[in-house]
């Protein structure tokens, strides 16, 4: 399956490889301007059961169940402290289940998170700052 993060459309869409549309989930549809669906990443469990969507307008990470795109959780808020975002823009999860979020513009930082279930248990400084 192909999962598409439609930034300005405030949604995730799912298609078969032949282009057949399967489903979509709107995430904060009232968000204007830059939209809410910046980048997405699959969880690292064998089933890849979760999707993590970075929302660079509302400064959040949304957690969705992959099979039906149900929203399970969200975390983050605007700000400059650990666990907060300024222009959140990218998301990645490594093989050790650590999540990385990157910020553009004035944010200019990467935060590293330790995931347990759907939420991070902690955020730590980027390797360059440790």
Feature-to-residue mapping (PLM):
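Eukaryotic scaffold repeat domains enriched in small/polar residues
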Residues: 1-130
């Amino acid at each position: 399956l192909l999962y598409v993060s439609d930034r300005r459309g405030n949604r995730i869409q799912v298609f078969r490889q032949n282009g057949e549309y399967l489903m979509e989930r709107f995430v904060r549809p009232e968000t204007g301007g830059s939209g809410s669906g910046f980048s997405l990443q699959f969880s690292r469990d064998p089933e890849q059961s979760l999707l993590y969507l970075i929302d660079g307008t509302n400064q959040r990470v949304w957690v969705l169940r992959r099979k039906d795109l149900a929203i399970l959780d969200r975390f983050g808020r605007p700000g400059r402290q650990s666990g907060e975002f300024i222009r959140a823009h990218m998301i990645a999860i490594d093989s050790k289940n650590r999540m990385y979020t990157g910020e553009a513009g004035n944010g200019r930082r990467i935060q590293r998170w330790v995931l347990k279930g759907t939420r991070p248990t902690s955020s730590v400084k980027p390797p360059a700052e440790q």
